[in-house]
């Protein structure tokens, strides 16, 4: 507030201003009354308005100064107040003087009767005007002598007009109205200047300034007019149109053009015509860019050698240097002018650069960085002889048409071009690809053409000197002929044209010419010498797999046919013949006519379409401009994840095709794909889409697509109603792609589910084959840029391949069998299907075999190929017989059991009728057969796959179905399809898997035909055989067929190698059968009468026995319940059956014995007291017709001496099955989501896998010590601790009552579950925890993991982070504010839900209640709470911003609050306002005060950190004492073994996990990695919070998280030991009252210091005198030098500094905080200060350019510090103890940022 003294002073100042104004007015009145005989000139009233505007502006400035003066009066510092008041008083006096002058002028204008102030005076010299300037008075202006002679009526000349007007003002000593500081001048002077500048304006420019009498407004209007028409693109094109070479001798024209461009940039870049450093550099670069390459170096050399003339500016000096260089280097002499140029008859330059050329600029249309573009110029008929005029009587607008005259055999001699071009690469010697995108304009075409490469053409001139034979020639495939420059030909070979252009030659050779349509032609074989076969031609290096070589190789027609996806033979031959592919190929044709049965069947047609219907329309459009599109589908499929529709777009000109597959064809999906396709064409091919043809389907005629086409300017052409033939090209291409895809699926025996990959493969192949209509590859024809295609880069679809398994285990195969699909559009690799993993992956590391046979036969042989015989088989004849049976079964299966794939599987009836009517597709018939399907269900497509996981143990059981019995023939086929090798059948007749490779076996399992697989595992009743050795003793047969003929369903157990060989003593036990049966109360299961062992099996519940009824005998069986009695949940058989029906591939029956506890089982099994021996006679085993089994099987069973164990599937799912999983913990599952045995076994095996979660080097892991949470059963139902149980009960009732009080739900309003959809019901759980302070807590939460998408929309929200808390504390401390901390109880429950959600009723599980509030666990609860709190705080005047969400403050900045979920910290300028705000919060929320100021000290914790705030001293300390104390207790025993140290890091880090091998078991490795993850999680939490001193040590050891070496554990415990010893270290903040706070960052880097040659960077960041952030990270890029690493560090430090600066600005902490960057790298500083630097690696160059730009803008200041003084050095490498203590002083703020700045060159 202003003091009374200041108010009295202010009144005195106001009185002085009024007195001065009155005195000035009286004086002016006296002057105006003086008589004058001068003729008066009228001035307009607008001048008065101008002065009034200026007066108002100065009054506003004066009011601002007064307000600032009042603020200064509140400052306590008297000395500072006096100094600032003195400066402010001077400023106020200046403003008051300007106000008095303006009032005087306004009164002068208003009191003048005739409003005339400009008077004419006459003296001896002539008529003149008097006016005053800002520097002098009574200046005379003579209109006749002072002439402004520049006139213009063109907007383009406005810069020249203003520049000349500026010179006029300077010459006649007017006030410089272009200066920013001058805002008003003498009215008489203003009138004079307005009249002068208006005389220079034409009619079109004077219209906008007719009524304007203010010179400033006229100048601003001209500038704005010019700027509005000269945007950045216009200016860039203006510079690109200029090319200066040595032939531009017209210095006046050249200077005028360059000066015009320079003035254009000056008036655009700056408001006045003054030079600035940025504009100076830009203009120099732009002028140098207009120079030809041959001229640029000469100009640069002159600039360095010639001293700069001080009298002229830099741009004029540069332009003069360019003109002088052009004149000196010009090759044209005065006596050399001949009749060549159509304008000046010169032979040394093209007409485009001639000074007499009308309406052309100096340069050529091309980007600055490209080579000069040479225009081909046609001669004017007036400059030719009569003979030439007769020969050139043709239409000038007609294009060249050389096709009629066989352009491949003729060469054009061009007299107006300076370059040689050819479209035939074979003519070029030493061909090289062009690395620069050079383009020529005007070479036979209206549009520009691109240059792909260059070489040399040899001319037959008869000379022996080979140098004179070679002409540099550019390879332009778009041109239609070879064009030779007449000038180049004469210069190199001295061959010239005769006078009448009838011959070309020299003294030795003469060639006859032929003139066609005014163009000179010669025969190619008479002029050009073709390269021989041994000539070296530099081919383009391929970018695909390095396994392919470019040397000439042979390829069979069959191989090419398969690689190119069974496309047409003629297309393949033409594509190879015309050299469309990059490699050199020699096609070996078949001796007989090539015949592909697959193609004939899959591509059969009814009749061909009519040809040439769209060809005329296509030729009228350029490539990529006209498209036709259509949709194909739906594709019938039983899988829901199969895409059903295909969108196709075909270019009418080039026939380039684009396809995409979709699940539906709604408007949104189709429009999104059309957008994507059009953007792809415009970006990748540089083409403009102008029209699209389609039918009238609703997917193409909706409003969304029409609006998009209108916005893009695309003409949408629709066919007539139901006229599909009008869109014939798209229809035919659909047929082509679909038949190609059908062929590929049939050839590869893949299911329809893979049709989208077949479509992609077919599309890619069709785009890379020559089209018969265009004779070009569609991909090459549509692209403006050069495209290389290699035929050998295509892989045959559906064929087998081997991809590299990058995660293979030791001593395991590194290859993974797979099936080739198609190219991956998002990578350089191919997509492969891995049957063993049931996944689709992308890889570029693959191997494919040599294809010499039909793929269908090859696949069949690979699937059913038998292995060699095992050496330990007893009877070789039996083996041979078995193999014979298997082969016969395979033959029968191939002939009789193939599933048929018909067109009905791919098309609907509507589409089939459409196909018949239009004859676009083959009619549905039985000629499209498909081979057997693989069992590829639930295919996962992923870019990353887990190929390291072990193959799970699979037990394939062959069972019978109750309603379906297999025949002997089918059974043999099924057995053959399982690929059981004879070598894998041991002498006892059972399969032995101990020597089977896992990868091979896994492949076999997945390659079983689906029809057989369903029969193998689809039955309800299964006979389970657990003891392989015992049952093999009982089953001995000569061949498998004899056993199979009995119709008996066998079960073959294939056990994992690791489990089978775990304990060999298990197989050496006595011949006693371990009989396991499970009891199910009141349940009976009847086996089928046919093909079963027993007719009735009844289970009854006894203590330790189960009675098995087979026939008339009841046998007691001892179960494993007596060994270990466990219980499990009840699983319903019906649910399991439902699960199997829903899955396409039912899970096989798993082995029910838990081998993990095999030792205990063995010991119990060998105990004769616990087990009884069972004997089964022939009466116990019924046969197919209900009688006994066959004599052969009966004999085998009797010989075994052991009974047959019978297991029913329902018994397997019995309630009492827990004894099988004695080592397994019981899992909780959802009530409605019971797991099958297959899932349980799968989860069990997955839990055994070695899964390592890596911690990245720069990962900010934030974790706290876990508090164990338990559920209701453990806390209350089964809790033996009565006291704890009582506490948990009370906590539960308290939570339930709180939910009722908060009106989260209403228990009185309940709904039946049947009334509410299942997707709206969310299950709940009750979580019980015991806090560290001993409080028991219960919380009812929702199961968000089961939440349906229908119950939530947007769930993302932004919250407060730890850096924002630190900013909050620093600002509050600097403002000397009062602080308190508090918690909001039940925070989420205050937020209302918008969605309709129901939860189970707390008292009646049959009902549900509606949820009204955001209960914990819901996905949207955090967002709803944040939105609710933000809305409330905004309503009471507290706002946050996007940079610091969760940090709110008022506009006066006197109240702040930081909220993280329910934890809050509040700061206010006074204690009263703080208490008022907390009371306001209490009225809306239930609060708990956790920390308050006591004696000006706040000692509390916030977000896990210990906070001590001393308001009186102005200090803040953040530590982690509490957390470190808990770590000390936790790891006390380990820390006793560690020697104490004063530094946390090691002296050296020499561990390399890539080289050092760990000697430990897999279990030890897994446990070690888990332990490392736990330790590093805690250390990362400590480091991230506030312990910056362990940053480097933790980040170094975090890279070894997957390497559990004892040395690594020692490093971690050493860090913990250091933390325990120095637990008081943290972050210290001091109150910083300096208003000019800087953001300071010091950086350092060490190159290649990591074990993998990566670099490490370190950054320390300050705000003012307080440290803000410290981090040590591994560089994201691999640096090759220390300078490059330092540049990365500087950029990272700048990025964080800029973020901090913007955040502070949003919080109102200074609008212009300077950024200071400190580094010890002198080369990095020098490189950043240079104007030009050699480009480095891409990302390094981008970061460097950003820093350079900021340095030029003076946004940052870069300083140099010595290496010893760089405190960030300890963040990149180990340092000594003394240097580390120096960093501790920085954390304690004993060494501040100002001390660091004092060590630099600041």
UniProtKB/Swiss-Prot annotation:
The protein's Enzyme Commission number: 3.4.23.-, 2.7.7.49, 2.7.7.7, 3.1.26.4
Subcellular location: Cytoplasm; Nucleus
Alphabetized GO MF terms: aspartic-type endopeptidase activity; ATP binding; DNA binding; DNA-directed DNA polymerase activity; RNA binding; RNA-directed DNA polymerase activity; RNA-DNA hybrid ribonuclease activity; zinc ion binding
Main location: cytoplasm
Region (Disordered): 1223-1248
Gene3D superfamilies: Ribonuclease H-like superfamily/Ribonuclease H
Coiled-coil intervals: 39-115
Residue ranges of domain RNase H Ty1/copia-type in the record: 1644-1790
Keyword Magnesium in record: yes
Record's keyword terms, sorted: Aspartyl protease, ATP-binding, Coiled coil, Cytoplasm, DNA integration, DNA recombination, DNA-binding, DNA-directed DNA polymerase, Endonuclease, Hydrolase, Magnesium, Metal-binding, Multifunctional enzyme, Nuclease, Nucleotide-binding, Nucleotidyltransferase, Nucleus, Protease, RNA-binding, RNA-directed DNA polymerase, Transferase, Transposable element, Transposition, Viral release from host cell, Virion maturation, Zinc, Zinc-finger
Pfam family, one: Pol_BBD
Post-translational modification note: Proteolytically processed into capsid protein (CA), Ty4 protease (PR), integrase (IN) and reverse transcriptase/ribonuclease H (RT) proteins. Initially, virus-like particles (VLPs) are composed of the structural unprocessed proteins Gag and Gag-Pol, and also contain the host initiator methionine tRNA (tRNA(i)-Met) which serves as a primer for minus-strand DNA synthesis, and a dimer of genomic Ty RNA. Processing of the polyproteins occurs within the particle and proceeds by an ordered pathway, called maturation.
Binding site for Mg(2+) 2: 1383, 1462-1463
InterPro entries, A to Z: DNA/RNA_pol_sf, Integrase_cat-core, PolX-like_BBD, Retrotran_Ty1/copia-like, RNaseH-like_sf, RNaseH_sf, RVT_2
Ranges for region Integrase-type zinc finger-like: 539-599
Active site per database record: 414
Claim: DNA-binding is one of the keywords in the record: yes
A GO cellular component annotation in the UniProt record: nucleus
Catalytic activity: DNA(n) + a 2'-deoxyribonucleoside 5'-triphosphate = DNA(n+1) + diphosphate; Endonucleolytic cleavage to 5'-phosphomonoester
Sequence positions that bind Mg(2+) 3: 1644, 1686, 1720
Domain Integrase catalytic intervals: 619-786
Other information: Retrotransposons are mobile genetic entities that are able to replicate via an RNA intermediate and a reverse transcription step. In contrast to retroviruses, retrotransposons are non-infectious, lack an envelope and remain intracellular. Ty4 retrotransposons belong to the copia elements (pseudoviridae).
Domain notes: Integrase core domain contains the D-x(n)-D-x(35)-E motif, named for the phylogenetically conserved glutamic acid and aspartic acid residues and the invariant 35 amino acid spacing between the second and third acidic residues. Each acidic residue of the D,D(35)E motif is independently essential for the 3'-processing and strand transfer activities of purified integrase protein.
Function: Capsid protein (CA) is the structural component of the virus-like particle (VLP), forming the shell that encapsulates the retrotransposons dimeric RNA genome. The aspartyl protease (PR) mediates the proteolytic cleavages of the Gag and Gag-Pol polyproteins after assembly of the VLP.
Quaternary state and interactors: The protease is a homodimer, whose active site consists of two apposed aspartic acid residues.
Protein name: Transposon Ty4-H Gag-Pol polyprotein
Organism: Saccharomyces cerevisiae (strain ATCC 204508 / S288c)
